[in-house]
Amino acid sequence: MNLNKIVAGDDIPNDIYVIIEISSNSSPIKYEVDKKSGMLFVDRFIPTPMFYPCNYGYINHTLSLDGDPLDVLVPSHYPIKSSCVIHCKPIGILNMQDESGDDAKIIAVPKSKICQEYKNINDISDISELLKKQITHFFQNYKTLEKEKWVEIIGWGNCQDAKLEINDAYNRAKKNSIFLNK
């Protein structure tokens, strides 16, 4: 499976393809796709007994400030299998830092063709406060039992902030020729 052939989106930053690494509500295991082989690897077992509140993945052909592709959380009623690709629209961003530096998380919902329920969700203000609190709580606490690891939540940003981050990460990857097929 060569996930490197998956484009970042049809209309960056308004339209993105998210490669799922971790299903929502799954066991506390951090998976990462190896960008060269496309295979899913176990990164680590998370000692804090928590589950991911949303499907967790990344946008291919992007480079975030931590040196990895840009992370994305995709809320849905159903867990999406690891290594699946889902067509999404960005609605917001959770800005945070960890022991490696800036570590933004884009929040994106499935395109309405996939699920009509998200048709009118266009900004982070359109999702429930409870879901935002669950996401914040997860990231504030999931590393607490790991030595020398920490997370600081900076705050939420809106759809425009998310699109700016996506553009920056896409252009950064392009400039550095990282994750791009030639």
Swiss-Prot record:
One Pfam short name: Pyrophosphatase
A GO molecular-function annotation: inorganic diphosphate phosphatase activity
Keywords, ordered alphabetically: Cytoplasm, Hydrolase, Magnesium, Metal-binding
Gene field: ppa
Superkingdom classification of source: Bacteria
GO process terms (BP): phosphate-containing compound metabolic process
SUPFAM superfamilies (UniProt xref): Inorganic pyrophosphatase (SSF50324)
Provenance organism: Buchnera aphidicola subsp. Acyrthosiphon pisum (strain APS)
Protein name: Inorganic pyrophosphatase
NCBIfam families: PRK01250.1
GO cellular component: cytoplasm
PANTHER family per record: INORGANIC PYROPHOSPHATASE
Cofactor: Mg(2+)
Subunit and partners: Homohexamer.
Entry's localization field: Cytoplasm
Binding-site residues, Mg(2+) 2: 71
Residues that coordinate or bind Mg(2+) 1: 66, 71, 103
Enzyme Commission number: 3.6.1.1
CDD domains reported for this sequence: pyrophosphatase
Record's catalysed reaction(s): diphosphate + H2O = 2 phosphate + H(+)
Sites where the protein binds substrate: 30, 44, 56, 142
Family the UniProt entry places it in: Belongs to the PPase family.
Annotated function: Catalyzes the hydrolysis of inorganic pyrophosphate (PPi) forming two phosphate ions.
